[in-house]
Structure formats: C-alpha cells, structure tokens
Amino acid sequence: MQYTPQANFCQITAGHTGPALQGAAVTRGGQSPPPLVFSRRICYNGTNSDSTPLWGWEVPLDRAQVQIPAEQLARQRDFETKIRDMHAQRPLRAMVDTFGCQQNVADSQHIMGMLEAMGCTFTDDPAQADVVVLNTCAIRDHAEKRVYGNLGALTHTKKANPQQVICLCGCMAQRPEVAEKVRQSYRHVDLVFGPQALWKFPELLYQVYTQRRRVFSVADEHGSIAEGMPVVREGRTRAWVSIMYGCNNFCSYCIVPYVRGRERSRDPERIIDEVRGLVAEGFKEITLLGQNVNSYGKDLGIGYDFADLLAALDQIEGDYLIRFMSSQPKDASHKLFDVMAASRHVARQLHLPVQSGCDRVLRAMN
C-alpha cells in the first residue's frame, strides 16, 4: 500500500453526512435530536414557529473558561524547547498532511509553527519523516477513507523507522469511535488529539517521547481559545486568520458542532493586531475564517459584532484585501452590507453556503 498525500482541499457538499456516528442520543420533551448526536452537551430548547425542534448548548458559555491562560501557553513553549534540545544532535524532520476545510489548513499552519519551534525541518516524504501528522476531516466519507488508507500505508514507514512518531489530529480524531478504532486497529499510531487540544500539541508529543506510550487527548470539551501559537504560513501573498471557532447551529447533516465545539469568538484587539502584522509583512489577501462569521461577537457580551470587526480592520493602512467565510444568511444584517459597501479593503463578494431553496428541505436540515 502506498501513501497518497492530500493534494487538494476536500470540498464540503450539501447534505453529505459521512458515516453514521455511534452513541446515545439525547431526548427531551418527547423530541429526538438531529442526526449525528453523540454528545451530552446539547439539549432540546423548544420549537420554532413551524413546530420544528430547536437545539442548543446545555451549559451557557463561560468566557473565563474558554480563554487558555497565558501561563499554560508558556508551558507549551517550554515543551517545544525540551523537544528541540532532546534532538539537538540530529534535528527532527516532520511531515504535515492536511485534509478538509480552510480552518484545517489554518490549524496545520499552527502545527507547523510548533514543530518548527521544536527544531523540525519539513519533508513531503513520510519515509523521511521522524514525525508524521495527519490533520483530518470528518465531513466527507471519502476523506476519512483516505486517512485510514494512509494510516495503513504508514505501517511500512514505522517498521523501517521504529522511532517515527505518527500523529492523528483534526475533526476525525475528536470522534470517540474513531479514537477507539485507532487504538485497537492502528497500533502504530502514537498520538491522537482533537481540535480542542491543538494548543497543547507540544506537551502531548513530549509525553510520547519521554513516557514511551501512546497518548490520546479527545476529551468532550466545549472548546477553547489559545492566542499566540506559533505559525508557519505557506506563501507570502495569502493568509488565513481564524476569528472564531465552533458552531451553535445544529444542522441535521453536519458534525461540526460536535467536533469543533460551541461558538467562541477571539477578542477583536487580537484579530486586529494579527491582521495589522500580516499587512506589514506584505500579505495582500487575508481571509477571515469561522464556521459562521456572521455570528462573530455574540458570545463576547460587549455589543461588538462582525460588522464592527470589518469596519475596524478596514482602518488599517496598506494595500490589501479582506475576504471572509463562511456566512450564515440568517445572521447577516443590513449593517454588515453597509460596512462592506463603504469599505476600501473588504472584497465585494459575500460567501453564502447555500444548501437548498426549498423551505421544507431547509426545515428538515434544521
């Protein structure tokens, strides 16, 4: 079996559910939750005006618990240094293979940043890599099959180099049944962690090296925000900037809320500083990322929304263009359109992931 690296991003298709998930469904008021539910984090919140069920997060968001403390992030930089020192005589080589959406691409750039801080150089050949990271997608069945096929192919590289560390991360890794399948059937995989644990990748990798054991970090968490992670951006023209994580919509066909957690917005000052830095570095096209950017700021509790963020970013001096994705139509506003129309730097395009034009189908899709 040959390893086949992911050449192109997987495109998310409307209504495609991928494989069925395992686990107990949550019920309340005689209603059943949307398909794909395997977490106790959600609950039935009544009905819409058309009697379709409403679903929401069971526990209110606590911003204090979402933000990863600076001292915990500093510890991760210490683990990076420790790993670099452990391999000072022969620096590690790493390969990062990304499946899925632009958010996964942005996550992989942070993974590469952390690996670079550990002293790693990069290769596209898994046979030459000391650390192999597969950042996975749980949206499409085809992408999952590619991941499992590549995991199987990596048994040969592991036999040739028993010291090789194989890591599985991303949305697939957050699913409990996937983690268990890897634990039982892919015993050459050393580290499995979901998107919620991305920020502590250095610590998890250090545990693999020092404790000589397999490490799994797929806790059922609401999600977090970690600022200041290292990043390696590919190219010098386009940059991805995550402005929020997770999703509060429970579309019946979509797994994202269950693997990415609830919506949580980054502080606007952090985003503005990051974009200002990218413009100063010469980046010309900056894409703001979120599962639903139009709901940015709702969890901040300061009366600051996505239109306010775009208006603030537009004030940055320089030659650049701002794009954003994805946009949920129900959360768009005239204020947003007015800001876009008056902006010097926001692209005259609105990304709308249209799923159907039929009200009945849309209701069935929640």
Protein language model features and the residues they cover:
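Short intrinsically disordered, low-complexity coil segments enriched in acidic
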Residues: 1-4, 359
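Short, positively charged and aromatic/hydrophobic N-terminal segments
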Residues: 2-3, 11, 41-45, 51
